[in-house]
Amino acid sequence: MDATNDATLSQDERTAALREAIRGEAFPEWVPESNNHIHTCYSFSPYTPTHAALLARRAGLRVVGSVDHDSIAAAPEMTAATRALGMGSVTGFEIRARFDPDGPLDGRKLNNPDSAGIAYMTVQGVPAPARAAVDAWLAPKRQARLRRTLAMADEANTVLAGLGLEPFDPCSDMVAASQYAHGGGITERHLLAAMASALIRGFGRGPALVAGLGTMGVTVPAALAGALADPGNPHLVFDLLGVLKAEYLDRVYIQPTDELATADEVVAFADSVGAIATYAYLGDVSASPTGDKKAEKFEDDFLDELFDAMEAKGLRAVTYMPPRNTPAQLERVHRLAAAHGMLEISGVDINQPRQAFNCPELRRPEFAGLNEATWALVAHEALSSVDPALHLLGRTGRLGPDRLAQRIAQYAPLGRRIADGEAADRVAEDATRA
């Protein structure tokens, strides 16, 4: 195994392996792209933070960001790896929250296919000195999520037993396969990967697997039927996991309760540590690039109302994935973000090996602002690690659209200087407060 992607090694060992590996490697020219939404082995991903950074560099990206579920553990490694590669980094975490428990949006399907009223949020640009506080805040949420996931594993094993198949061992096949012992999170994908492996062992590979899924009532999308029936498919577990997430998870799913913060609490915590809380826009889905989401309606019917609620809760940023949305959806989100004075952050979910790190949409002129905002975030994280007062958006309050544009224009060049290797404390001398 490539040492940069060996999850059994320490973070220092992986970054040391990276520095050795890149000595003789010829990398491509930089492209005007970034990705601020990469999952690593500290939630669910085939990649360590070091290897994710390396793959991003091989794709020509200049900035990469990690947002693991309920975990900040990837941050120091991602930062060190990107520095070795001459890249910028933006680190944080992803979390689910009760968005509007006492308001009119409670019970609405937001950006979460599994739960009404519960939203995916990210907290990005976490200053390095705040990582310990972030980990302490997330730890009980990880523990509660593990308990719930173990209960769902019991439900999944009941299904397997009913099919006459050997169940999986939640401890060895799910928990031990994660980085939970090292501050990583446990997600439904860990559960479904264990279940997928058990189904493959039980039904066998090839057409027998597809036939077995049919006996479970699983609808296999036409686009994935060939891959699931291919006995030589090297990504079979990931492909089957995606189908199970879209088509079967609801049969074993237990709704989260005590592990959830409210959106207001997430915003307050992010502000307290100098990070930036965001709402992750999904939008109505017609077809999922990864096969893990069914065609379904999400926020678009009430998006104006949602942005009003986001502003009322103190959210100062929105993140979205340009490849997953239509031009009309993207234009509308951009217009609303500008009207509400919200920073726009781009990123493409990376959690399985078929996904490309590139986001060619960001090369289009209309998305130039997203690249500049990313560079401003690079500066924000590094500079606020030196001086908390150098927060891109200011520690509290909301910037007007013109002032926000000015801050991005000032901070983006500083982010590039940091990626070029200049010390953050030196760059901080040229930064101003919001």
Where are the predicted features?
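Generic hydrophobic/packing signal
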Residues: 93, 125-127, 160
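Outer-membrane beta-barrel translocator/channel fold
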Residues: 355-363
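Intrinsic low-complexity, glycine/proline- and repeat-rich
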Residues: 383-434
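Non-catalytic, alpha-helical, charged scaffold/linker segments
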Residues: 129-222, 415-433
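General structural signal for secondary-structure boundaries
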Residues: 48-52, 80, 163-192, 205, ...
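Active-site gating loops and adjacent loop-to-helix segments of metal-dependent hydrolytic enzymes
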Residues: 101-144, 196-251, 363-386, 391-392
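An N-terminally biased module of ancient metal coordination in phosphate/nucleic-acid-related enzymes
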Residues: 1-118, 242-269, 273-274, 279-355, ...
